[in-house]
Structures are given as structure tokens and as C-alpha cells.
Amino acid sequence: MPELPEVETAKNGITPYLEGYLIEKIIVRQPKLRWEVSPQLAQISQQKITALSRRAKYLIIHTEQGYIIGHLGMSGSVRIVSARDPVDKHDHLDIVMNNGKIMRYNDPRRFGTWLWSANLDEFHLFLKLGPEPLSDEFNAEYLFKKSRKKQTPVKNFLMDNSVVVGVGNIYANETLFMCGLHPEKITAKLTKAQCALLVEKIKQELKRAIEQGGTTLKDFLQPDGRPGYFAQELQIYGKKGAPCPNCGTKIESLVVAQRNSYFCPKCQKK
């Protein structure tokens, strides 16, 4: 699944081809995605794109009259193509620009979506989201306060979008390893120092992933078709049975909140 760095990479990749240009039309080939594509999108014409941004794992295209909001789901991607490029069977939506470029959305599993909102402040999917992990609002004091009385595993806590957005499975695994915390550690038992370290490492890991173009998983490509390169730097995710990079102990895995979790039993004692 594309996580925050992958969505940020996608945003950065398509911005030069969209920002400041007019949308000629939006072609919706398959409206039945995770949530049905907003019917307003097919009516958009001659609207200028004024900016692109991201909230959590949502890609936001700002126009003069409202906002096109996309989520890449489990296997979705966006890329820049021209009218000459053939359409794939999983190419569900095109945003056709007046500069000859097309932003094409491909999603084999159809778990993504494209929606319309006239007002971001009232957009229902954003109302209960926590702070952005790279913002000043996400700090040690905030995380420690949120962790009090929480009896859930710390990995669940970090992946709760009402606590902080965009820390998905890959980066939760990596961060907990860097902090020496077992994924099943009870959240309420976190110390202030541990919360401070978590905040530091989450920010560090996400920034590094963004700089390197997202994580190379089987489905993720950058908008120009190149893979991300951060998977080469992952220390523990997906490496069950491999030696821990710190101590050499075999990496183990377990399921936490229906997601695979990887940890070193020596470095991350419960």
C-alpha cells in the first residue's frame, strides 16, 4: 500500500505538469472504486489547477472552484502520460490538461478513490484526522499525552490516524526497531523519553523515504515510472529470518492488528 512518503513523492512528481494549467476534461472509465468516483469530476472543464497538496495519504488537487481528492488505495498509482500513450485496462481515470499532458490513475485492485469537495474544512474524511507527522504539532509532549491510559499495542497506536496520520505498517515497523520497542508493548507504559524518541525517528524515517522517492514495493512506481529506492534501506520490514542489523539475532514476525510485524527479540524486548 502506498504510504505517506509515496503519496508525497507522487504529489511532487505530478505538480510541474498540473499546477497553473487548465483541466480540459476528466475522463472516468471506471467509477466503481472503493468509494464511487464523485460524478462532479466528469463535469469539470476549463478549471485552473492552483496548487497540489497532501493530507495524510490523500492527494489534493486545488482548483478555482473546489478540490479533487484522491486516495491511491492498496495498489493505485498516478503517472504523467500523453494522448499517444495506450490505455491499460486498469487505467480508471484521466485528468486531461491544456498543456498536452494527462495525469492517469491506474489501480488494479480498485481500492482507491477520487472525490470532490467544495470545502476542505468540511470534507468528511478529514474531520477526525490527527496531525501530520512532519508538523510541529506532532511532538513528544503531544504523543505522551495521547498515550496515557491507552491499553493497545504501541504499533496500533502509531498507525491510528486519529493520533497521527500517515505512519503506515512499513514505517511503524522500522521506527519501533530504531527505538528498541516491541510492537506489542502497551502504549500507556511508554515513557516521555520513549515518546520523544518515537517522534524523532518517525520524522527522520519519513523525511528520508521522501528524499529517496518512496519505498520500492511490488506496486509502487514514481509518476515517471521509476521505482522508489527506500526499500534498499529498510532494516527490518519483510526480513523475517534475516540477521538483525544491530545484533545478528534472527528477525521474527507476528501479526498485530491483522498486519505483519517484524522485530528483533533481543533488541526489542516486550
UniProtKB/Swiss-Prot annotation:
It catalyses: Hydrolysis of DNA containing ring-opened 7-methylguanine residues, releasing 2,6-diamino-4-hydroxy-5-(N-methyl)formamidopyrimidine; 2'-deoxyribonucleotide-(2'-deoxyribose 5'-phosphate)-2'-deoxyribonucleotide-DNA = a 3'-end 2'-deoxyribonucleotide-(2,3-dehydro-2,3-deoxyribose 5'-phosphate)-DNA + a 5'-end 5'-phospho-2'-deoxyribonucleoside-DNA + H(+). Its cofactor is Zn(2+). One of its GO terms (biological process) is base-excision repair. Binds 1 zinc ion per subunit. Pfam families: Fapy_DNA_glyco (PF01149), H2TH (PF06831), zf-FPG_IleRS (PF06827). Involved in base excision repair of DNA damaged by oxidation or by mutagenic agents. Acts as a DNA glycosylase that recognizes and removes damaged bases. Has a preference for oxidized purines, such as 7,8-dihydro-8-oxoguanine (8-oxoG). Has AP (apurinic/apyrimidinic) lyase activity and introduces nicks in the DNA strand. Cleaves the DNA backbone by beta-delta elimination to generate a single-strand break at the site of the removed base with both 3'- and 5'-phosphates. This is Formamidopyrimidine-DNA glycosylase. It comes from Mannheimia succiniciproducens (strain KCTC 0769BP / MBEL55E). The gene is mutM.
